[in-house]
Amino acid sequence: MKRIILLASCVFASYTALHAQKKIYIPEDLRKMDLQADTSQWSFKRSIETDDLILMWERGFGSDTSNPPMLEGKPMSFNLTNLRDRVQEFYHFFRDTLAFSLPGSKADKYKMMVMVNYSLDGTAYGGTYDNFIGALWVAPNRIQDAKMNCMAHELGHSFQLQIPADSVGDAWGGSGFFEMTSQWMLWQVNPGWLTDENYHFEAFKQLTHKAYLHLDNIYHSPFVIQWWSDLHGRKSIAELYRQGRIGEDPVMTYKRMYNMSQKQFCDEMFRGYQHLVNFDFNHARKETRQYACTFDTETEGGKWLRPKNYPEEYGFNAIKLDDKVNLNARKFRLNIQGDNLRYGFVGITTDDQSVYSDVNATEFVVPKSKRLSPLYLIVMGAPLQHYHIPMPTDENYKNPQKLLEFPYSFRIFATR
């Protein structure tokens, strides 16, 4: 995400829209323009409004967004009505259901802004104008799908950054967690997200060993956030943002909010990964059935097996045991060698019921009259203390700090 916060003085201009309850904030970038003239780059003559939004499109489109001039031989049309309606739906959901905006927000008085650029740039941005009101910027090539997935993601950023704009939270000063959260917010309004953007899930299955908050996974993995939402309610994620402090990361804030020790946090993260295997969440159960139990960490070795990639901090391996033991057995036993780990089993019965072992269990007993298909061993890296995942800088971008790995090996035995 490109955090667009354009600093301005505390003095601002505003335009009161006719018959609109909320006002329109005039960003510093637009104040030198005649916004009433259709010859200006941005003009109220090329805009539409809802109760909560103003959508503006650049001069190059002309007045008809369904039939604008081509740019470098490329069509520039988009469905303005669908864009308006979908973003308004997202707005209501993020405000009312997820509580990313609370009473007293500047968004109570001012409309968020959707700016459609006459450009072939494939990048969309969500943030705020002048650190004052939520806004997003997009080109037509990102708003061609009827579901407007890109808009849900970017409006998520607008709401995230409205929190510091309202001075009700620092939200850690920025981190990859913003991208994870926008993917989660998109997933909430589109339960079919895993299908629409399946490449993210396929990539994540190859990278589950990566540390939580690792930048390689920030677009792939809203699943821990979903787990936290299951545990504490959907509105808890926005509250996490409000409670965030500069100098913390989301894990530190989360532990402080819920008064958790490092051991408790590791146990809870492991439980979340057990649930992830079969997508046992309160959200999108039907839509995730085709992706349930598709994790399969590669292993190597002889009698003692080890994963191809050891887990990093809070990263995990989901090792499918179907070809390693006889699933008709009633009991399974684990021998594991390694330090600072969380491990245990997840069995999925043939009638799609999940059976979880305790944390650090070395035995798994199949419930009576049940048969398994499949059985998983879950192993997670569990650091004794939490520390920041280093963000890339100009100095370390090509050679980032190497993260801790948690090596282990294991054997599985099945008994009748």
PLM features per residue range, with description:
Residues 30-38, 114-119, 352-358:
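Short, solvent-exposed secondary-structure boundary motifs
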Residues 128-129, 145-150, 165-231, 235, ...:
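Acidic/His/Gly-enriched intrinsically disordered linker/tail segments
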Residues 49-174, 182, 192-193:
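Juxtacatalytic substrate-recognition/specificity segment
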Residues 8, 12, 162-163, 244:
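Residues that line or immediately flank small-molecule/substrate-binding pockets and catalytic motifs
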Residues 1-22:
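Bacterial Sec-dependent N-terminal signal peptides
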Residues 248-416:
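Beta/coil-rich, acidic/histidine-enriched accessory regions frequently appended to metallopeptidases
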Residues 11, 158, 228-231:
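Generic, well-ordered alpha-helical scaffold segments in large soluble proteins
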